[in-house]
């Protein structure tokens, strides 16, 4: 168990015996520190019964890296160099938001990220100027998409073309070697969802601003014949609206947050929300149709907003088929929400 991590080492516990259904008591002991600071840790079971934790090493502008354990979390090791550190060569405050997913065999890690100027040291409003919209925005707008593939045996980091990259990756090196989509100053609050297609290749679902900073759209991003393409799916109501992507045998399923009006203000609404919809494609992502609304409807839920749609995962990080989790609220100011579970 690892909890309480945000710019701290958190609390790391290991059970003395395997946790099993029906066992009345579980005894936990404090485990060694994984790293001095961890933020946004993601944990996966990978090849050879190893465990992987991928994390940001401190605050917004810090590097991202990973550690691997072969003994149930007692000891950890990792690469000599971190994977990314966008502001390491003088581009002060350049940062990234990242999503990651192991390959089907657990030998590789797929990582996709956006970039943004955090503008925290010697802040200057003009650094938030967005030329597409001819206005200042904020650090809540993240741009472009970048992709790397990490070999979890050798720690080599490669781009989509298979080129071995120098690490840590800074912002200029990233633009030259890792960029898969120049969004031309269209921005998002969240990084994309990632899912593997039937060939085991990564595909992405990403929300982006459109005609102005109050209109948004979801895109399906994939690589075909050596080129990255993007297909629009549907409109959305906020740059912080989440999403989830899943590949079934002959259908791609996109779970999105839709709405007609841009949300702003309030403790809860300032980070988006709307209704949860499922959109599907049966032609490899070329065209999409809305299949259903997943979030509750009816008089009791009039005015509710929903967000953070995600898969239910097992202890090894794999998804439970047919189950989704999301959150909803009706008070824009109260810092609380209810969880909803969908099992088709």
Language model: regions and residue ranges:
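Extracellular, repeat-based ectodomains that mediate carbohydrate processing or recognition
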Residues: 1-344
């Amino acid at each position: 168990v690892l909890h309480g991590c945000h710019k701290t080492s958190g609390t790391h516990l290991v059970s003395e015996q395997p946790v099993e259904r029906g066992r009345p008591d579980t005894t936990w002991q404090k485990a060694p520190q994984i790293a001095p600071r961890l933020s946004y840790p993601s944990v996966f079971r990978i090849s050879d019964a190893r465990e992987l934790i991928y994390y940001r090493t401190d605050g917004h502008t810090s590097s991202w890296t990973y550690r691997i354990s072969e003994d149930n979390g007692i000891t950890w090791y990792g690469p000599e160099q971190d994977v990314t550190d966008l502001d390491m060569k003088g581009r002060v405050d350049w940062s990234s938001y990242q999503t990651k997913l192991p390959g089907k065999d657990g030998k590789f890690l797929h990582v996709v990220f956006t970039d943004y100027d955090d503008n925290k040291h010697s802040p200057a409003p003009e650094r938030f100027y967005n030329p597409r919209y001819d206005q200042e925005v904020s650090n809540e707008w993240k741009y472009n998409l970048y992709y790397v593939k990490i070999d979890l045996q050798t720690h080599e980091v490669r781009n989509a073309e298979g080129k071995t990259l120098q690490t840590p990756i800074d912002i200029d090196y990233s633009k030259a070697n890792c960029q898969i989509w120049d969004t031309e100053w269209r921005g998002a609050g969240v990084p994309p969802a990632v899912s593997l297609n039937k060939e085991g290749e990564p595909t992405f679902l990403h929300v982006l601003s459109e005609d102005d900073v109050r209109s948004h759209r979801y895109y399906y991003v994939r690589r075909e014949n050596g080129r990255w393409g993007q297909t629009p799916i549907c409109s959305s109501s906020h740059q912080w609206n989440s999403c989830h992507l899943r590949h079934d045998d002959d259908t791609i399923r996109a779970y999105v947050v839709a709405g007609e009006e841009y949300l702003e203000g309030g403790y809860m609404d300032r980070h988006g929300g709307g209704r949860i919809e499922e959109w599907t494609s049966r032609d490899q992502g070329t065209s999409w149709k809305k299949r259903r609304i997943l979030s509750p409807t009816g008089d009791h839920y009039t005015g509710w907003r929903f967000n953070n749609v995600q898969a239910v995962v097992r202890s090894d990080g794999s998804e439970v088929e047919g189950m989704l989790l999301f959150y909803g609220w009706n008070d824009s100011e109260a810092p609380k929400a209810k969880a909803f579970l969908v099992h088709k």
